[in-house]
Regions:
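Glycine-rich oxoanion-binding loops at beta->alpha junctions
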Residues: 56-63
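Conserved small/polar residues in nucleotide/adenosyl-binding loops
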Residues: 173-177
């Protein structure tokens, strides 16, 4: 059900015609993972006429853009999200410290400043703020508690888009099909 809801969200709100769906797992091989994940995979394979299932995806490939929807349980998903946030923070802080070490690194920063600012803007978590709660009879978007007004506005934007595209009504139609 969550794969179908995620697919509906990707189609309706993001505008992806045929979203690729994967299950988050400890490996891409069919024999890996808990039995409930293997059972979910079999179910998704059997729904190939209505869902574009691409099999398992490992945590280290989440950000590669190979698939559009990654399905997981809430516990595992939260760990994956917090790990990504922590890694991004660690990378940012380490880079800042490295660029302060010597006159040469400071000079290097000045030469790469425009590229680094573009990279920082691309990685800004506030742009992606807003976790959508799917499967409810209404629109619920949770904002990260540590965000600022810009991040909060983006979460409101997600909710607005869901309302604009009549996500609840249209997703019911997709799920019944």
């Amino acid at each position: 059900q969550f794969a179908l809801m995620g697919q509906a969200f990707a189609k309706i709100v993001i505008g992806i015609k045929n979203p690729k769906v994967s299950l988050l797992n400890v490996g891409e091989e069919e024999i890996k993972g808990f039995s409930y994940i293997q059972n979910a995979s079999e179910t998704l394979k059997n729904l190939s006429k209505i869902i574009n299932y691409w099999g398992y995806i490992e945590g280290d490939r989440i950000t590669e853009g190979l698939v559009d929807v990654i399905v997981t349980d809430g516990f595992t998903g939260n760990i994956a999200l917090k790990t990504a946030e922590g890694t991004a923070g660690f990378f940012t802080n380490s880079l800042k410290e490295a660029l302060k070490k010597s006159i040469f690194s400071k000079l290097g920063y000045l030469l790469a400043k425009k590229s680094l600012e573009g990279f920082r803007a691309h990685m800004d978590p506030r742009k992606y703020n807003g976790a959508v709660f799917l499967g409810l009879n209404g629109i619920v978007v949770k904002s990260h508690g540590g965000t600022d007004a810009f991040g909060f506005a983006n979460a409101i934007g997600v909710a607005y888009d869901m309302a604009k595209y009549s996500f609840i009504a249209v997703s019911y139609t997709h799920l019944r099909a």
